[in-house]
Structure formats: C-alpha cells, structure tokens
C-alpha cells in the first residue's frame, strides 16, 4: 500500500553525470495531482485516496462527476485513480490537497510505471512475435513471410487457443518495473526515470513505488 501519482509522458531526453556518462531518461509531468476523495475503513470498508489529474472542460464532465469534484472543492480532472494507503497516512491528508512530486518520491528510488503502449494496427507474426522470415529463393514461392503451419493432425483437428498468429499489435496496458528515478524537478513537478516507458508522448501514465526487488546478479 503505497502512494502513487498520475502523470503525462512528456518525452525522452538525456542527463549527464558528473563523470560524463549519458543517461537516457523519460520525463513525466505529475503536476496537479489533487485529492478528490478520502476513503476510510468506517465509511467505505478500506482506506484509500482518490486522485484527480489534469484538466477537463466543464462540458465534458457528467453531472455526477461534476458534483463529485465540487464536493471536494477541486477542479474537474481527466479521470480518477485510487491508491490504497495506511490509515495513519490518510489521517494527515485532506480533500483538495495537491501532492507534489518530491513528496511522493525521491531521486534514486525504484518505481513501476504503467501506461498504454503505442497501437501499431494489424501486424504479421514477424513484427508481432519476431518470427524468422522464410528463404528468399531456392524453392520458396510466395511464402517468404508466412508463419508456417498452424494446425495439427486430424486429431485434435483444430488450432489450439493462444497460437501465435497475426493480429492487433500494441494499444494494451503495460507496466515497466524497477525503473530508477534519475532526477526530480520539484519546481516544475517533473519526474525523470532512467529508460523508456510505455505509450506515446502526451499519454497518461501511473507511477508507483516498485513492488518487486530484482534478483542480484551472481
């Protein structure tokens, strides 16, 4: 149970260390994370906070959501996300409170970043699953990029579910684990994580403390 933040992927850049090493980083804008609701064990059966992020036109907000935001005294946001926390941490929070980047995370901390990968449309098995191409010649006639046999014999006489075939590639929720925060710009509420994260620039991402500890290399 840890506090996370909702952000927007800005893009990638690089940072230079004091030793001159170049580190590729992804910049995440986590500004305007505000508490829209506080849930407690007594009223909701569990302890959690509900965060709103970004802005949304009043004409694009339903009356139910508009009332929900107005009750907390916060500006309408682009969706809501919940984070379950300990009751002791929730007791220190109030509806409408804005959570800055340096409050939730620190430089050097490992985080998990969840986003929706870039959609690539209908793709073949070579692009989708890295299948090898067929022979370019020597008896190969119009079968250079086909996946090959997909079936069985008369028994069972069907294609098993889960068979790797052509289909839609991308546009799915993915989580990259154990990314290291290289730097936090507290003034502009920017988090810079080492490496790449899912999604296109401008896409919504959720940053949470890492839940798994990577195995040490022997």
Swiss-Prot record:
A Pfam family the protein falls into: Ribosomal_L3
N5-methylglutamine, modified sites: 154
Keyword Ribosomal protein tagged: yes
GO BP term (any one): translation
Keyword line: Methylation, Ribonucleoprotein, Ribosomal protein, RNA-binding, rRNA-binding
Coiled-coil blocks: none
Family stated for the protein in its record: Belongs to the universal ribosomal protein uL3 family.
Function: One of the primary rRNA binding proteins, it binds directly near the 3'-end of the 23S rRNA, where it nucleates assembly of the 50S subunit.
HAMAP family: Ribosomal_uL3_B (MF_01325_B)
Protein name, as recorded: Large ribosomal subunit protein uL3
């Amino acid at each position: 149970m840890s506090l996370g933040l909702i952000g927007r992927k800005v893009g990638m850049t690089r940072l230079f260390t004091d030793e001159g090493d170049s580190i590729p980083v992804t910049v995440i804008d986590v500004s305007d994370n505000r508490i829209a609701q506080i849930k407690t064990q007594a009223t909701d059966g569990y302890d959690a906070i509900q965060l709103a992020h970004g802005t949304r036109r009043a004409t694009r907000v339903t009356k139910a959501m508009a009332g929900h935001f107005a009750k907390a005294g916060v500006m309408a946001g682009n969706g809501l996300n919940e984070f379950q926390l300990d009751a002791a941490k929730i007791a220190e929070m109030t509806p409408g409170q804005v959570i800055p980047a340096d409050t939730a995370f620190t430089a050097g901390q490992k985080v998990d970043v969840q986003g929706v990968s870039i959609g690539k449309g209908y793709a073949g098995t070579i692009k989708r699953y890295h299948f090898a191409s067929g022979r370019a010649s020597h008896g190969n006639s119009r079968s250079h990029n086909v996946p090959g046999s997909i079936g069985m014999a008369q028994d069972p006489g069907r294609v098993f579910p889960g068979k790797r075939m052509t289909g839609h590639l991308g546009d799915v929720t993915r989580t990259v684990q154990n990314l290291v925060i290289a730097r936090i710009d507290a003034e502009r509420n920017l988090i810079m994580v080492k490496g790449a994260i899912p999604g296109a620039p401008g896409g919504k991402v959720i940053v949470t403390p890492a839940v798994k500890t990577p195995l040490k290399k022997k």
